[in-house]
Amino acid sequence: SFIDATLESGKVFVFYETLFSHFKDELLDTPVANVSMLCTWLQYKYEKEFYFDKEYMTRDRYIDIDIDHEVISYMREQWQVKSEDEVVKALDYLPEDSVRTAFNRNTNVLIAATRGMRFHIDKFEVSEEELNDIIFIIETTIEKFQFIGADELFDYIHQNLPQLINNNSDISELGIRKALAVLLADK
């Protein structure tokens, strides 16, 4: 069954919403018309095998499910730019809306590369020396002109730190800018 396959894959929980979505077509001709009814039926059928939480069932009573952590960990493991839909499909054992929310709200870890595409900040390759060079140019330009535009900064990076662009060749210019903004936010 889908429940057994999910649990055997190393997951210790199964969300009712995910089960309902997975079996929606099979449930059309049954009294199970919504997630709530499915939950009630599962509690009856698996009463002695599982613990039942509000949103999921598990064999471990003390489990704490953190969907943000699941999404962030997946993105880090993938080590590439991924679309929101790709992540939803890969994490089909989690509720779709929750995955989409986690994908879009963790903007300091999952960096926007283009519309609907993100990567994990750890994928961005930049050395401390490169960051210090960027900080220096920002500070000196602001000191001299009271402002530095993103285009000016990116031109400087292209001319003086081409290895930063080369090391992150699969990340768009927007993604590089956003990653730098996150890394330099506290400096």
Report the location of each language-model feature.
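C-terminal non-catalytic scaffold/interaction domains in large multidomain proteins
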Residues: 1-187
